[in-house]
Amino acid sequence: MRKGYMTVRSNKCIADHIYQMVLEGEIAEVCGAPGQFLHIKVSDSLTPLLRRPISIADINKAARQVTIIFRKDGEGTRLLSLKQEGDQLDVLGPLGNGFPAESLEQGKTALLVGGGIGVPPLYELSKQLTNRGVHAIHVLGFASAKDVFYEQEFSRFGRVYVATADGTRGSKGFVTDVIENEGLQFDCIMACGPTPMLKALKQRYPDKEVYLSMEERMGCGIGACFACVCHTEESETSYVKVCLDGPVFKAQEVLL
């Protein structure tokens, strides 16, 4: 983990309220595990006070750049959406434990399941898995056609299936419907998205190796404030800190 300034190289809207930002700086050189995140100070003032956790979508160490994708949903991300090329951002990262891309053997098949703003970290994951000789299948869920992003980008690494709640793009319904209707075969699931989606995957595939990236509100980002705790299967009183112990967990470790 490092703390430093990163320079905004580009910032553009790629879907409804969805922005893609490229950041350049030394922190990119120590990014590696897919699924980690950056903790970004969005303003030089005290408002908003807390940093914003944004997952890393793509890592380019040679260019010292990382790409983040975020949804404009609140004052913090609104301010972030206004950043221009050349602006400097105070960044802490990379933080958290990512997906174990190295755990899958060459020739195995990974099913990558993303929901909404949980889609971005799966892009770097898919890239790394493909480079290791692992086959990737992508199932991406969105509310509507206007919310869909990175469908074409993911197709570079394997098959892509899109589901929308209203049926305006791809299949109508949930990501779990696509998996069953298409009869997808896989060795492992790696997913990021809203809790109901993660819970459904955990319940439907108890015999599969399933890794889940949790979406929780965070305060400090380093495990000190206890704002992002998640209960575990071990007992009602045991918990993990999503920012420090996660955000990626084995499905059987966490209580959803």
From Swiss-Prot:
It comes from the Bacteria. InterPro entries: Cyt_c3_hydrogenase_gsu, Dihydroorotate_DH_ele_sf, Dihydroorotate_DH_Fe-S-bd, Dihydroorotate_DHASE_ETsu, FAD-bd_FR_type, FNR_nucleotide-bd, OxRdtase_FAD/NAD-bd, PyrK_electron_transfer. One of its GO terms (biological process) is 'de novo' UMP biosynthetic process. Binds 1 [2Fe-2S] cluster per subunit. [2Fe-2S] cluster binds at residues 220, 225, 228, 243. The keyword Disulfide bond does not apply. CDD domains: DHOD_e_trans. Residues 1-101 form the FAD-binding FR-type domain. GO terms for molecular function: 2 iron, 2 sulfur cluster binding; electron transfer activity; flavin adenine dinucleotide binding; metal ion binding; oxidoreductase activity. Belongs to the PyrK family. Heterotetramer of 2 PyrK and 2 PyrD type B subunits. This is Dihydroorotate dehydrogenase B (NAD(+)), electron transfer subunit. The gene is pyrK.
